[in-house]
């Protein structure tokens, strides 16, 4: 459920709507609380834009908590009473659409009901319900005017859904008799097919050869063969040998003791059916995997985690270390492959410390001695014999080499005897 606020001046009325409700319900639910006596000539504004009140909330683009202004339409603000319906209602272009038929175009006012539209074109008895802007209206709602559903002006499409046609009793008699006759014919054909199949079965049975059957032999149980003794002890080698059958057991002549011994041997050597199979059971993959995990957990401790690296992990780690050792750093690679070219000149700004500064450009062939001679030429004879040169960060300037090797574009400070920095040095 969404809450929409109907506003008039400083008054605000909350209205709860479902997504399938029309915006006309905002007017119908709030017009009395906002001080209006009639809802027929009221319209909605969202900001400064007029809202189509026939749209469903889910199709209107209005979000939850939106504020809609309720006001009288411009046609009703000409001094007429708001309780009376405006006689100059606008014409609405209506299109009636039946499935499988051409559209019927008609014009109606907002006070016209759906029932009146259908009666004009003799469609009232043929239609069960209609669909307007995605909302279904049943026959009980046909008496309401279009204005009640928010249809005030413009054009509207009404989809008509016809009543399901029911066949009359006279028209049903013919197909019933036809289907009954067809069922009888099908039943007769099925019976004929069953008779033919039974005759074929009898012919097949009679074609088999006939043998005499002895019923007594069929009822007799089959003899169970007793397996021969695998080995005979040395103490019973003198016993007479006799074949073992299902009807008689081996006997020994004229000696009761020997008979007892033979019976004991026969009992001990009869095959016994044991529940345990002589062949080992084939273990399933899941049981083998569970056993391996259990053994690993016992070997590794109570935590159950295997922290020992495998052979493949060790080999991978060693290959990574070899690659890192063979890699050359980017700085050394750039230095060796492409040496930095020396600048063609060096621009130096000399700061003499008393607010005096000179900028001079040296060529790539000038060395540090040339630079010192240039500085000495701008000093007094006393100061030119002893002075020091430093960079802007007071780092001492080299005494040998080319200028472009050490200076590209820099500030050089000149320290004389009167300079306290020179005295400290």
UniProtKB/Swiss-Prot annotation:
<keyword id="KW-0963">Cytoplasm</keyword>
<feature type="compositionally biased region" description="Polar residues">
    <location>
        <begin position="236"/>
        <end position="254"/>
    </location>
</feature>
<dbReference type="InterPro" id="IPR001012">
    <property type="entry name" value="UBX_dom"/>
</dbReference>
<feature type="region of interest" description="Disordered">
    <location>
        <begin position="224"/>
        <end position="257"/>
    </location>
</feature>
<dbReference type="Pfam" id="PF11470">
    <property type="entry name" value="TUG-UBL1"/>
</dbReference>
<dbReference type="InterPro" id="IPR021569">
    <property type="entry name" value="TUG-UBL1"/>
</dbReference>
<dbReference type="GO" id="GO:0006511">
    <property type="term" value="P:ubiquitin-dependent protein catabolic process"/>
</dbReference>
<dbReference type="GO" id="GO:0012506">
    <property type="term" value="C:vesicle membrane"/>
</dbReference>
<dbReference type="GO" id="GO:0005829">
    <property type="term" value="C:cytosol"/>
</dbReference>
<keyword id="KW-0597">Phosphoprotein</keyword>
<keyword id="KW-0833">Ubl conjugation pathway</keyword>
<dbReference type="Pfam" id="PF00789">
    <property type="entry name" value="UBX"/>
</dbReference>
<keyword id="KW-0539">Nucleus</keyword>
<dbReference type="GO" id="GO:0005737">
    <property type="term" value="C:cytoplasm"/>
</dbReference>
<feature type="modified residue" description="Phosphoserine">
    <location>
        <position position="338"/>
    </location>
</feature>
<dbReference type="InterPro" id="IPR029071">
    <property type="entry name" value="Ubiquitin-like_domsf"/>
</dbReference>
<feature type="domain" description="UBX">
    <location>
        <begin position="341"/>
        <end position="390"/>
    </location>
</feature>
<dbReference type="GO" id="GO:0005634">
    <property type="term" value="C:nucleus"/>
</dbReference>
<comment type="function">
    <text>Involved in CDC48-dependent protein degradation through the ubiquitin/proteasome pathway.</text>
</comment>
<protein>
    <recommendedName>
        <fullName>UBX domain-containing protein 4</fullName>
    </recommendedName>
</protein>
<dbReference type="GO" id="GO:0006886">
    <property type="term" value="P:intracellular protein transport"/>
</dbReference>
């Amino acid at each position: 459920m969404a809450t929409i606020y109907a506003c008039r001046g400083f008054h605000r009325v909350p209205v709860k709507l479902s997504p399938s409700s029309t915006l006309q319900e905002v007017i119908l639910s709030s017009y009395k609380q906002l001080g209006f006596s009639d809802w027929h000539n009221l319209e909605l504004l969202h900001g400064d834009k007029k809202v189509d009140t026939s749209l469903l909330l889910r199709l209107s683009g209005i979000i939850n908590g939106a504020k809609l202004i309720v006001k009288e339409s411009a046609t009703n603000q000409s001094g007429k009473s708001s309780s009376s319906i405006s006689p100059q209602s606008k014409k609405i272009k209506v299109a009636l659409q039946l499935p499988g038929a051409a559209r019927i175009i008609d014009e109606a006012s907002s006070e016209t009901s759906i029932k009146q539209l259908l009666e004009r074109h003799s469609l009232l008895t043929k239609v069960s319900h209609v669909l307007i802007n995605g909302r279904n209206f049943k026959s009980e709602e046909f008496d309401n005017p279009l204005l009640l559903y928010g249809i005030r002006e413009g054009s509207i499409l009404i989809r008509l859904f016809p009543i399901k046609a029911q066949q009359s009793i006279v028209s049903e008699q013919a197909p019933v008799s036809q289907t009954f006759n067809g069922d009888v014919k099908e039943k007769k054909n099925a019976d004929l097919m069953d008779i033919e199949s039974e005759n074929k079965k009898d012919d097949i049975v009679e074609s088999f050869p006939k043998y005499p059957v002895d019923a007594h032999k069929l009822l007799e149980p089959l003899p169970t063969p007793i397996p021969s003794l695998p080995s005979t002890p040395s103490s019973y080698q003198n016993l007479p040998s006799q074949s073992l059958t299902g009807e008689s057991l081996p006997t020994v002549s004229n000696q009761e003791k020997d008979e007892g011994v033979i019976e004991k041997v026969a009992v001990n050597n009869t095959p016994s059916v044991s529940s345990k199979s002589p062949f080992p059971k084939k273990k399933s993959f899941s049981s083998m995997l569970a056993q391996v995990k259990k053994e690993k957990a016992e070997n590794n401790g109570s935590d159950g985690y295997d922290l020992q690296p495998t052979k493949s992990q060790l080999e991978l780690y060693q290959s990574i270390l070899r690659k890192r050792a063979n890699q050359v750093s980017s700085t050394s690679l750039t230095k060796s492959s492409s040496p930095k070219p020396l600048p063609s000149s060096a621009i130096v700004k000399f700061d003499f410390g008393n607010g005096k500064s000179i900028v001079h450009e040296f060529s790539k062939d000038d060395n540090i001695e040339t630079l010192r001679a240039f500085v000495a030429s701008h000093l007094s004879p006393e100061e030119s014999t002893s002075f020091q040169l430093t960079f802007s960060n007071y780092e001492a300037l080299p005494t040998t080499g080319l200028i472009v090797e050490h200076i590209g574009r820099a500030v050089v400070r000149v320290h004389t005897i009167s300079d306290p920095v020179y005295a400290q040095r």
